[in-house]
Regions:
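Extreme N-terminal starter segment of soluble prokaryotic enzymes
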Residues: 1-4
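Short catalytic helix/loop segments, enriched in acidic residues and glycine
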Residues: 19-44
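Glycine-rich nucleotide/cofactor/substrate-binding loop typically near the N-terminus or early
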Residues: 37-94
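C-terminal accessory domains and tails appended to enzymatic cores
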Residues: 193, 200-306
């Protein structure tokens, strides 16, 4: 069995503030250590359950957040974003995906760093219903026959994801500062929480046969509400239907719908023909930058480095 571990960062154990997720900051370097520890425990869980192969796909921002030299060497690591299949790259040979450190949807009140796909949106709707990233990403993977069987993150993020994939296993992660800055109590929470990641990930892999690919039948109607009308005007270079700050598009399936979403978000029309070499160059640049030129970590009083 080939298990894919997709890694965001906001829902990691040890992280409690936004700048720990913002690339290039000393606080983010601490956040990377937190994420890497979480991912390593999920890798261990997958192999505990006799996975044949494990591939870690880094999905946050430019896609180079895990500290590669600290990852379990049994796993393959894929950083950066790809063109085909859009965003994630090759997903065809995964038997199961485990999604680590997710966050809540744009507009979720009281959530930690909520956003859907990118921070420019105040809400994203599919067929009239507000959706989180799990609704979109899991349905996209489902078009290729790949089920998502595990999620970890704060309570509301997990709750939103499980509505889309109720068969998935989950681990809830606390986002309060005091949880991670209270000495021995915090260290105990981190140890127990990450052991839970390992145990539940193993459970998901063992029960992979019961996990279903999420398929949302078309036709699909997307509505992306930008935070301002100015942002909508700036990003909508494709001439999608637009009313004020809301941009809409239709698709026959999630593959087409997600491709258009990425066009709107990441690829202005005049850049689109050059997307392949640009993606290749960006992967190389950020792999080097984030590996060799990262700042020293600032744990901001956390009880442990990760």
């Amino acid at each position: 069995m080939h298990v894919g571990i997709f890694a965001d960062i906001e829902g990691s154990f040890g992280i409690w503030r936004m700048r720990q997720c913002r690339m290039g900051t000393p606080e983010w370097q601490y956040g990377r250590e937190c994420l890497t520890e979480d991912v390593n425990h999920v890798i261990k869980g997958a192999f505990d359950a006799c996975a044949d192969r494990v591939t870690v796909k880094d999905t946050h921002e430019v896609g180079f957040n895990c500290i590669i030299k600290k990852l379990d060497p049994r796993a393959n690591y894929v950083g950066g974003h790809f063109i085909q299949p859009t965003f994630f790259g090759n997903v065809l040979n995964y038997d199961l995906v485990l999604y680590v450190a997710i966050h809540a949807a744009s507009g979720t009140k009281g959530a930690f760093f909520p956003h859907t796909h990118y921070g420019i949106f105040s809400e994203v709707r599919l067929n009239g219903r507000p959706v989180c990233e799990a609704d979109i990403y899991c349905a996209y993977l489902g078009e290729f026959g790949v089920p998502v069987g595990f999620v970890s993150g704060e309570d509301i993020a997990v709750e939103q994801a499980i509505k889309a994939i109720p068969w998935a296993k989950s681990v809830v992660v606390d986002k309060r500062k005091e949880t991670y800055t209270s000495g021995e109590k915090s260290i105990k929470y981190l140890i127990e929480g990450r052991e839970r990641l390992r145990e539940v990930a193993a459970m998901a892999v063992r029960e992979a046969a019961s996990m279903k690919p999420l398929v949302v039948p078309g036709p699909l109607h997307f509505e992306a509400v930008f935070r301002t009308e100015e942002l909508a005007n700036k990003f909508n270079t494709w001439g999608f239907d637009q009313t004020g700050a809301m941009v809409c598009w239709n698709a026959d399936n999630m593959i087409e719908g997600f491709e258009k979403f990425n066009k709107l978000t990441f690829f202005p029309k005049n850049i689109y023909p050059f997307r392949r070499p640009l993606a290749f160059l960006m992967r190389g640049f950020y792999r080097i930058k984030n590996t060799y030129f990262a700042p020293r970590p600032n744990p901001e009083g956390a009880a442990s480095k990760a």
